[in-house]
């Protein structure tokens, strides 16, 4: 820029002239060179309307010649604009997986409090697609500045995001990604690769066993999470490629009738007494882990997901062999950061942001800290 301080800048009305510019280029310097008002320069820099094409072109030419980089941080602080974000998450109990996501959301929004940001969290029933539709319609009516959503089934998510796009509202996916409906950014694991990896770990435990079981939580045929479905797809892909002769059994526990879990597990193990290996793709591996403890079954290998307190307890007590973690706090925090970077600081945002696939054992759990 210093070489350009004494450059010939063309003024449409006055031709070329030498300009002595200060070390720090100010908006009023650009306005003088472009022969426009300070307000016009400000509108061009921040992409606002109300500027003629001729004035916009002159300002942009000078900005380019000076390699001017606006101080978006200072501009945002000086602005009185308020930014409202809404997050749409599955309903959950305190202490479950989504509680950690909420923690990340609130911690992130607090760091941007100087920029008049606020966040509201709305919920939908993950086992009821109409609940998602109703919750999304309520968000659209409010027309927030940005949205973060944990997607449900693609066809229902697309109905929501199509309307967000029509309203020019940027949106973030967390937990699971829908490739046919690209967001501003996605934060979460590569679900299929995670399931593929989980199958490999499962078979390191199972060795030559010919039967394994997948435990699910289902309500009226709905698993309640795209990510769980994609993990299972990846899991089955690995098994088909490397252990095609291994039988994969299934036990679907009722999502809303937890009091029946132990009875259903008892019936399963009476029917399949030789099964010694299983996995659950949701965050409630503790349901099976606590059952195994209560029945004194110490010869069963169980893999689960997420560092819920009850899962970690089962891991330490031996009824869960491995836990796969995905840093939910960071997903929530990074989603808010991406919205702020895009809307407030006008930064480019990376679209696909995969979280690591972290494998935790009883020997490593006490030394693990999500980043």
Where are these regions (language model features)?
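Single conserved hydrophobic/aromatic residue that forms the stacking wall/gate
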Residues: 1-12
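N-terminal helix-turn-helix DNA-binding module of bacterial transcription factors
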Residues: 10-76
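Hinge/cleft segment of the Venus flytrap/periplasmic-binding protein
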Residues: 62, 66, 222-223, 239, ...
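Amphipathic helical "hinge" segments at domain boundaries
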Residues: 71-130, 134
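Hinge/beta->alpha junction and helix N-cap segments in small-molecule ligand-binding domains
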Residues: 90-99, 121-131, 188-194, 216-234, ...
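Hydrophobic alpha-helical
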Residues: 146-165, 249-310
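Flexible loop/hinge segments that line or gate small-molecule binding clefts
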Residues: 156-193, 309-316
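Hydrophobic alpha-helical segments within soluble ligand-binding/sensing domains
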Residues: 186-212, 261, 327-344
